[in-house]
Amino acid sequence: MHIAKNLESSISGFLDRIPFISFYAKTRGWPYVIAWSHRIAGLILVAYLWFHTYTLLSLSSPPLYDASMKVYGSFLFTILEWALAIPVIFHTLNGGRLILYEGFEMRNDGTMIRYLLGLSVVYVALLGVLMMMGTQSVSPVFYWLTMLIAALTLAYGVASKFWKTQHSLLWKLQRISGAFLLVMVPAHLLFMHLNPSVGKDANIVIMRMQNWFIKFVDLSLIVMVIYHAGYGVMSVVRDYISFRVFRTGLAVLVILVMVIFAWVGIKLTISI
């Protein structure tokens, strides 16, 4: 209990020292800050999704992929990879908080936000430790079978709660895909940093992706991530672009870009 309170106090103190966050927290409240942070984190992850897909294209030429990974293995890129865990886990856990709020009537926002911040710190610290060790290994099939079962169970629980509501089908699929990704995306980031060779050695990456079960997992991730990301960007466009023609044009562009990246990702996964 004391550890949790000390952690909460440390996080709150750190955030209060950031002028921009502190100003809006005091004038608009923490829910406002959390909501905007969720959108910003989501947009960062969409940008990373595009970048990640682009880097994986070089798997068609293993020497080129290995050369790229040497650059991405530099100290600066390693720090950026670790920092990526912040928007990943924040967006993931806050999405879980929203699902609990909307569908399961858990309205104690103060407590939920404290858990959100505390668990985010724990995850980022754990990833940092694993990256520094760089010596861990696990059976890919066993790891992803466990995670897939957990993700599907969670997604089914959310689907059973939301499916009979009056919301649109697209809205429901956004929540269901979010529940699935709540497990799979943090798990993917952890898996890729258990050992440097897991994500940076072309031959090991290709060998893993040639397994039919891993292909199924990767394809599931691609479909869920692309849909969730596309819906999220469309929501931002709809909420903050008032000019109808411009909003429609952006929506079409978002759909086109997401379809292209989905096609590229699916084609790459199947062809390896």
What do these predicted regions represent?
Residues 1-272:
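Membrane-embedded alpha-helical bundles that constitute the cytochrome b-like, heme-associated redox core
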